Amino acid sequence: MTTALDQLKQYTTVVADTGDFQQLAQYKPQDATTNPSLILKAVQKDAYKPILEKTVRDHRNESTDFIIDRLLIAFGTEILKLIPGRVSTEVDARLSFDTQRSIDKGRELIKLYEAAGVGRERILIKLASTWEGIRAAEVLQKEGIKCNMTLLFSLVQAAACAEAGAQLISPFVGRIYDWYKKQAGADWNEARDGGANDPGVQSVRRIYTYYKTFGYKTEVMGASFRTTSQIIELAGCDLLTISPDLLQKLQESNDTVARKLSPDTLQDKPAERVAIDEASFRFQLNDEAMATEKLAEGIRVFAADAVKLEKLIDALR
C-alpha cells in the first residue's frame, strides 16, 4: 500500500525540518530547513560533535559570530549533499529588529555558501517576519538572494511578506495550536477544536487562500507541526516542513491522504488586500494577541539558543 508520506508528496513538496541530516535519506525530502534550536540540538549529538569541533579548531582565533556562520554553512553544505533542492539557513534572531544588519548577514551567508561551491539558487535565508526582517528580505530578494520568512503567525505578516517579494513564508501551525489550547484550558475539546478546525491549520488555509486569490508568487510552506493530523489537513499546500519524528509516522501510516488545498477550489476568498504600510502592519499585528505573543516568544527562544551555541563554541577554544 502507498504510505501517507508518499500520498502527501503527490500534492505537496515535502521538506525535512532538522539539523540531524543523517536522517534525511530515508524520507527523501525535496528541501530541508534548519533553525538555531535545531543546530544547537544537533551539535550536542555524538554524530555531529566533530563538525562543531573542526569548525572551532579551524577558526579558533576568530570571533564567535564568525565561527557560528561557518558552522551554519558546514551543516547546510552537508544537507545539500543529501537533497535535490534547497536548504534554509537562519539569520541570528538577535538581528530581528535591525534591517541593515540582517541584510549584511544574509549577504555574508550567501557569500560563504558560494565560496563553498554552493549556488545561491539552493539557499533560502531565513528571517523573522518582523517589519524590519521583511524590509531586509525586500532588499535581499532584489539582489537574487531568496528569503524564507519565519516566525509567521498572522495574515498581516503574510501579506507584508508577499508585497515585499519574499520567495517563501513559513506560517507556524503548532505554536498557534498551542496558544489557543492553553487559552481554552479545560474548555478545549480536541474532537471539536482539532482537525480542520485547528486554529493553526485555519491560519495557514487563510494565508494560502489570500495568496492564491491575489496571485502572489510567494511560496507557502506550513511549519511547526505537532501532529500528523495537522499535516494531512494541509495536503496541497505548496510545501510543508516536517520534523523527522512526524515524517516517520507518515511513512509508517497507510491512511488515505486527500488534497485539502488547491488554487482551483478556494473557499472564503478575501474581498480586498490587507493594508501594508508600517503603521497598519504594527497595529494589526499588535491587535492579534496570539501573533504578538508568539512572535516575541519565538525570537526570545531562538536568541537564547544562539547564546547557548556561543557558549558551546567558547568552551572548545
UniProtKB/Swiss-Prot annotation:
Reaction(s) catalysed by this chain, per the record, are: D-sedoheptulose 7-phosphate + D-glyceraldehyde 3-phosphate = D-erythrose 4-phosphate + beta-D-fructose 6-phosphate
Keywords (alphabetical) are:
Cytoplasm, Pentose shunt, Schiff base, Transferase
Its Gene Ontology cellular component terms are: cytoplasm
Per UniProt, subcellular location reads as: Cytoplasm
Which residues of this protein are catalytic?
K126 (schiff-base intermediate with substrate)
Q: Name one GO biological process term.
A: pentose-phosphate shunt
Identify the SUPFAM superfamilies for this entry: Aldolase
**Xref: Pfam families:** TAL_FSA (PF00923)
Known EC number: 2.2.1.2
UniProt family annotation: Belongs to the transaldolase family. Type 1 subfamily.
Describe the function of this protein.
Transaldolase is important for the balance of metabolites in the pentose-phosphate pathway.
Q: Subunit info?
A: Homodimer.
What name appears for this protein in its UniProt entry? Transaldolase
Gene symbol here is tal
